[in-house]
From Swiss-Prot:
The organism's taxonomic lineage, starting at the top: Eukaryota, Metazoa, Ecdysozoa, Arthropoda, Hexapoda
SUPFAM superfamilies attached to this UniProt entry: YjeF N-terminal domain-like
Cofactor(s), names only, from the UniProt record: K(+)
NADP as UniProt keyword: yes
Protein name, entry field: NAD(P)H-hydrate epimerase
Length: 226
């Protein structure tokens, strides 16, 4: 059985990966994996309009990469990136979205706008470094995701969930799709949605042994269903 990681294990594993790979390389593979998982569950023919919600950390970077790949797969992504990270890696990812002519919005969509304008929300707001409560700046966005009927695909962690314990009283939305990256986190044991995929086909054998990950065989795929 695949190992589900604690928050401290996930952080330590990430640090080990950063010693072996450039963070941009890992982000590219993670974001592409997310796009593949979306395509498996929500085809562009039925869910073309995707709101990609990006947070200020690595999870948001994964979202920017995913938006770019979704645009190449026939989707019509729109990026909402309320707190951009002022580092060259993230600025480059943002510029790449601009070059792909991916539109962005400056304000958090209202509940009615989200349900009228989008067929899917990609939640790349908070990652496994998150600790409750949700920052005040992001409360309206999380509230919209809690109340919307638009299906949500969450990247690694449903935003606002405790990384180990799962749903919190102030954030209890259930995504339709959870895309765990590298290895699932403990909160994924509480996931009750329809689709759970694992992406991140880049963990060297030594790290798989060190953390006893027992990862599935990806074969030629970028993601596997759990």
């Amino acid at each position: 059985m695949v190992k589900y990681l604690s928050q401290s294990e996930a952080i330590e594993l990430d640090l080990d990966l950063f010693e072996m790979f450039h963070v941009g390389q890992l982000m590219e593979l993670a974001g592409l994996s997310c796009a593949d998982a979306v395509a498996e569950c929500f085809p562009a023919q039925t869910h073309p309009r995707v709101l990609v919600v990006c947070g200020p950390g690595n999870n948001g970077g994964d979202g920017l990469v995913c938006a770019r790949h979704l645009s190449l797969m026939g989707y019509q992504p729109t990026v909402y990136y309320p707190k951009p990270t002022l580092m060259s890696l993230y600025e480059n990812l943002t510029n790449q979205c601009h070059h792909m002519e991916i539109p962005s919005v400056k304000k958090c969509p209202s509940l009615s706008d989200a349900e009228e304008d989008y067929d899917l929300i990609l939640d790349a707001l908070f990652g496994f470094g998150f600790k409750p409560p949700v920052r005040e700046d992001f409360v309206p966005l999380v509230k919209m995701m809690q109340e919307t009927k638009v299906p949500i695909a969450s990247v690694d962690i449903p935003s606002g969930w405790d990384v180990e314990k799962g749903k919190q009283s102030e954030c209890d939305f259930e995504p339709k799709l959870l895309i765990s990256l590298t290895a699932p986190k403990l909160c994924a044991e509480h996931f009750k949605g329809e689709h759970h995929y694992l992406g991140g086909r880049f963990v060297p054998p030594a790290l798989q042994r060190k953390y006893q990950l027992n990862l599935p065989d990806y074969g030629s795929k970028l993601v596997v269903r759990l």
